[in-house]
Regions:
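Residues that define the transmembrane beta-barrel architecture of outer-membrane proteins
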Residues: 34-40, 66-72, 99-105, 147-155, ...
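Outer-membrane beta-barrel "beta-signal"
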Residues: 254, 266, 275-288
Length: 288
């Protein structure tokens, strides 16, 4: 199983170097509109089949999010022989610049439908997420004096197929609830990245309210010639009463040595009424 395909980190235990009991993961993205996004996660194994982590992240750009918006997560994961379960609570403290914040959590279940000796398999996953946001809103075109609190939820289904441990295919779909009393036209700088609710396939933050998302991904294992994977993906995002968006990703994951991996990727993103935007990602894993 390659971690670049699944959004959850619960499969990390299956690829840990021998003797590794904790590791660091730094995920950095940059690109159009001055995007600067960084996420640092510490993982450890406190008990057999159990992984726990601490994450701190921020994003900023040269637009309305021109100050760093911080967030924190505590991923907890159990991995068994036929299924894995992950729960990840998250928090966006109310920011002094955006005056927005959020908290919530995501529950993820992965199960194996078939496992073959030649490394072929079929795995299905289902996840649900919930969030409570607080943000400024417009009322009759004027900024309202009080912030608005609202609730979001999502449901996501993924299927991943491996052929001989060489080719991997993944398809996923997610649907989002309709929040009461707010819309993309009235929300002002909401803080929460929607990637905390479902896999988006985008390297930048997505704070607009989605309606649904569909994604497809493919990856190729380059072993034994090269100790790496190459991958590509596509996402279609439908925003609630707003333009739809298309997102393409492509990259390579390199095993630098027994103690480190490097993932380098490119993302092209376009909303229907906008021009193409380019984003780049560097993800480094260090095992100890």
């Amino acid at each position: 199983m390659i971690r670049l395909l699944l959004a959850a980190a619960i499969t990390a235990m299956s690829v840990l170097p021998a003797g590794a009991v904790w590791w660091l993961e730094n995920d950095y993205s940059f690109g159009s509109n001055g995007l600067n996004r960084n996420s640092l996660t510490f993982f450890t194994i406190p008990a057999r089949n159990l992984t726990a982590g601490l994450n701190a992240a921020f994003y900023k750009d040269s637009g309305v999010y021109d100050h760093k918006t911080f967030s924190f997560r505590v991923p907890m994961m159990y991995s068994g022989p036929r299924y894995s379960v992950s729960f990840k609570p998250f928090l966006y403290p109310v920011d002094g610049d955006t005056r927005s914040g959020a908290y919530g959590g995501k529950l993820f279940l992965l199960t194996s439908m078939s496992e073959e000796p030649d490394e072929s398999y079929l795995r299905l996953s289902v996840s649900g997420a919930w969030a409570r946001q607080k943000a400024r809103v417009l009322a009759a075109g004027v900024l309202a004096p009080a912030k608005k609190s609202f609730t979001q939820s999502s449901a996501e289904l993924q299927a991943e197929k491996s052929f001989y441990g060489q080719f991997y295919f993944l398809a996923s779909a997610a649907a989002f609830s309709k929040p009461d009393g707010v819309s993309n036209a009235t929300l002002v700088t909401p803080a929460m990245d929607q990637a905390d609710l479902a896999y988006m396939g985008v390297f930048r933050q997505i704070t607009a309210l989605p309606d649904w998302i569909m994604t497809a991904q493919i990856a190729r294992n380059m072993k034994p010639e090269y100790d790496s994977y190459i991958y590509a993906g596509y996402s279609k995002i439908s925003y609630r009463r707003a333009d739809k968006a298309n997102s393409f990703t492509g990259g390579i994951k390199l095993n630098l040595n027994e103690k480190s991996n490097l993932d380098m990727a490119y993302n092209a993103y376009k909303e229907d009424s906008s021009s193409w935007k380019s984003y780049y990602k560097l993800l480094l894993q260090l095992f100890f």
